């Protein structure tokens, strides 16, 4: 009568004879269901971990009436919820104030921070996958190789959705976690100096000099056999629907920014009698900034040797 009954899970696919389960006898179907029933994978437990945060700080300060100092050190580390995801930060701050005499004050401060983060370069939401993935599915085959997920993408096609193309090894989320990576490293540093001089009782000079540096770098790697690499195959062109060729890639971005500022000013002030006050300010400021960024992507990348061999287009194109 044209009625379509949806396939529910792996058992529905087996009973309906979908895909690789076609032409199975009832006994073979029962044996396959029993085999799958021996496996119970808790995907939330496999994919996620307890998020632990550690922070440590140390500060020192001291000095005398004329000179004082302050130094602060910090370190923090956070493990993300998804396995192989973490974040680290290092920072140091220092400040020195000096008064050589009653007319001169000098202050110098420096700050530096380094942040590093690593995570898999996943193109599938791990929370969604853990919720919908079949507990019958295995992570590894008996020989230790990655086991292909036979239902996460296939079940939608079995129920009439678009057939998502997969590499020969199928999809395995742990292959994506272990063979893709996204590493970022950011650093910022600044140096500031302040000078104050009372030239006369009613004439003073204020000066400031500062310099800042910021750099950001990231490496995104997709291993050759990953689904992320499978979805990024520009050298196949219109043949990508039938081509099985795969190649890894690395995407690198580097950017940095420098800035400086110089400022000086003379301030004159005086009071005449009881009701008259005069104030004059003369100053100058120079500032500048420079930034540069580089983007690079290489296909055919080998993470072990660091070399890449760019694929060529098929002759049919």
Regions found by a protein language model. Give the residues of each.
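Residue-level signature of outer-membrane beta-barrel architecture
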Residues: 62-64, 75, 98, 195-197, ...
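Alpha-helical support elements that line or immediately flank enzyme active sites
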Residues: 192, 197, 211-213
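Predominantly transmembrane beta-strands of Gram-negative outer membrane beta-barrel pores used
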Residues: 47-48, 55-77, 81, 93-99, ...
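Short structured motifs
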Residues: 55-57, 192, 250
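Periplasmic N-terminal accessory/gating domains of Gram-negative outer-membrane beta-barrel systems
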Residues: 41-51
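Surface-exposed loop/interface segments of Gram-negative outer-membrane beta-barrel transport/assembly proteins
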Residues: 1-40, 80-85, 91, 95-188, ...
């Amino acid at each position: 009568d044209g009625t379509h009954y949806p396939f529910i899970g792996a058992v529905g696919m087996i009973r309906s004879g979908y895909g690789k389960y076609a032409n199975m006898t009832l006994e073979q179907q029962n044996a396959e269901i029993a085999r799958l029933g021996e496996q119970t994978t808790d995907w939330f437990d496999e994919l996620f971990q307890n998020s632990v945060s550690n922070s440590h700080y140390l500060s020192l300060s001291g000095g005398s009436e004329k000179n004082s100092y302050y130094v602060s050190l910090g370190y923090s580390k956070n493990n993300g919820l998804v396995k192989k995801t973490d974040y680290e930060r290092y920072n140091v701050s220092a400040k020195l104030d000096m008064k050589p005499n009653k007319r001169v004050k000098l202050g110098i401060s420096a700050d530096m921070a380094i942040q590093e983060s690593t995570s898999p370069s996943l193109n599938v939401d791990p929370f969604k996958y853990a919720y919908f993935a079949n507990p019958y599915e295995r992570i590894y085959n008996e020989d230790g190789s990655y086991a292909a997920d036979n239902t996460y993408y296939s079940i939608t096609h079995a129920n009439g959705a678009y057939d998502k193309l997969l590499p020969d090894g199928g999809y395995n989320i742990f292959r994506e976690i272990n063979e893709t990576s996204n590493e970022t490293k950011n650093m910022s540093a600044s140096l500031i100096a302040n000078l104050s001089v009372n030239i006369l009782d009613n004439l003073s000079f204020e000066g400031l000099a500062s310099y800042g540096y910021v750099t950001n770098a990231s490496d995104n790697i997709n291993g050759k056999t990953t689904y992320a690499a499978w979805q990024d195959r520009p050298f196949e062109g219109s043949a990508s629907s039938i081509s099985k060729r795969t190649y890894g890639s690395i995407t690198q971005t580097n950017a940095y920014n420098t800035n400086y500022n110089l400022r000086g000013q003379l301030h004159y002030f005086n009071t005449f009698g009881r009701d008259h006050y005069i104030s004059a300010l003369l100053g100058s400021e120079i500032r500048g900034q420079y930034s540069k960024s580089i983007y690079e992507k290489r296909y055919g990348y080998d993470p072990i040797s660091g070399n890449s061999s760019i694929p060529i287009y098929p002759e049919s194109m």
